């Protein structure tokens, strides 16, 4: 009987119940909330489901992300090896490859002025950087946090890894993806605040057709120019444009299909679960996380406002030919931000179709956020 009792006692001590803290229960509840938002409300389900599940796993069984050095048997946890791919910036780069293979840069090529709107929206990133410095972050952690303003999860993860801010990676990634999902809620009030009803109702001329040659040359030219000026962007911009060249060349359909489907989804699973696994209670429930969430929101709002305000400038310069609403799409949440521009414009005039016009700044924002990350890496000599 003593053997049975001892066995039962050992089994009881092996359960997670006796080892969980109140913080673990809080994070488990957050994981449940994210799963609800992803499945029921369909807020970025492809990303929030794996992130939430990784969060759930690590707060029940912390050893799932333990490193080999910390493990008693010298073997790391499963998600530790996924996470190494984040630290090495492999997964974010592969995400960019897939995004490039899925992205139509036609609206940007047809209306190059969209580049300026995409650049203007990056103001939120640099304003948040200086605000983060004032809030006590060091220069590298401030840069890693401020990139959230681009509403681009992979770039946020990429820069945090490159700058050695892996301790902040979990809160940064969760904040970035959360704001991507909340674009339809956060942006409209800002857009309406800085525009008039007349401006929101402006109809833009149809975009010109883009030739196949232009589409093929675009990724080659962008890669050459951007990487010559900022070589640190080669990893992200290079992968983005390689994926797009797969798409537009028309001669490697198998590579296009693989990059935009099978590879993309595999990488999303690895990236999401490993990022979620960095959100243990000890790492996540602290004042730094609150600061990151606030700074991310400020950066995103400032970026949206800057895009809209620059859109107003272009509207004035072109004598009313550009609807300022498309400026808000300069953040790199593709295609959510462009859809929001369309929705807000349609509220004033249901016959106003802004989606394709907004896609120009939207895809420019993807390039712009990658360039902003490259600027930070160049500043810090990475």
Regions found by a protein language model. Give the residues of each.
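Hydrophobic transmembrane alpha-helices of secondary-active transporters
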Residues: 34, 57, 85-109, 243-246, ...
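Membrane-embedded hairpin module used as a gating/binding unit in multi-pass transport
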Residues: 178-251
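Entry/N-cap segments of selected transmembrane alpha helices
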Residues: 108-129, 280-307, 358-362
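Alpha-helical transmembrane segments
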Residues: 167-185, 295-303, 326-329
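Transmembrane helical segments that form the transport core of multi-pass membrane transport proteins
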Residues: 223-307
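Alpha-helical membrane segments and immediately flanking helix-loop junctions
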Residues: 88, 96-102, 117-127, 131, ...
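N-terminal alpha-helical transmembrane segments of multi-pass membrane transport
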Residues: 1-74
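Interfacial helix-loop-helix linkers and transmembrane-helix boundary segments
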Residues: 39-48, 67, 81-82, 102-117, ...
């Amino acid at each position: 009987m003593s053997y049975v009792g001892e066995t039962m006692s050992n089994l009881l001590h092996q359960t997670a119940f006796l080892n969980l803290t109140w913080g673990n229960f809080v994070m488990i509840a957050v994981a449940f909330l994210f799963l609800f938002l992803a499945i029921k409300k369909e807020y970025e389900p492809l990303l929030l489901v794996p992130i939430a599940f990784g969060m759930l796993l690590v707060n029940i069984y912390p050893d799932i992300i333990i490193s080999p050095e910390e493990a008693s048997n010298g073997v790391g946890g499963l998600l530790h090896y996924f996470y190494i791919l984040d630290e090495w910036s492999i997964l974010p780069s592969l995400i960019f490859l897939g995004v490039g293979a899925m992205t139509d840069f036609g609206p940007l090529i047809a209306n190059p002025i969209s580049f300026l709107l995409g650049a203007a929206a990056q103001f939120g990133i640099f304003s948040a950087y200086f605000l983060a410095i004032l809030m006590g972050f060091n220069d590298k952690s401030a840069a890693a946090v401020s990139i959230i303003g681009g509403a681009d999860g992979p770039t946020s993860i990429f820069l945090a890894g490159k700058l050695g801010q892996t301790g902040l990676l979990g809160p940064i990634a969760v904040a970035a993806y959360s704001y991507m999902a909340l674009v339809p809620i956060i942006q409209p009030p800002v857009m309406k605040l800085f525009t008039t009803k007349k401006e929101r109702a402006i109809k833009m001329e149809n975009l010109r057709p883009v030739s196949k040659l232009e589409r093929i040359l675009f990724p080659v030219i962008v890669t050459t120019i951007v990487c010559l000026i900022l070589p640190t962007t080669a990893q992200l911009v290079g992968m983005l444009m390689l994926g797009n060249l797969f798409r537009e060349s028309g001669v490697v359909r198998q590579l296009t299909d693989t990059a935009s489907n099978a590879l993309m989804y595999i990488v999303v699973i690895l990236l999401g679960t490993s990022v979620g696994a960095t959100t243990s209670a000890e790492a996540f429930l602290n004042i730094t996380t609150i600061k990151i969430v606030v700074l991310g929101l400020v950066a995103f709002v400032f970026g949206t406002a800057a895009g809209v305000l620059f859109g107003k400038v272009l509207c004035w310069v072109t004598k009313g030919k550009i609807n300022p609403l498309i400026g808000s799409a300069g953040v790199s949440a593709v295609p959510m931000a462009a859809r929001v521009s369309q929705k807000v414009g349609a509220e004033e005039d249901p016959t106003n179709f802004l989606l394709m016009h907004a896609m120009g700044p939207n895809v420019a924002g993807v390039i712009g956020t990658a360039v902003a990350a490259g600027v930070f890496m160049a500043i810090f000599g990475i």
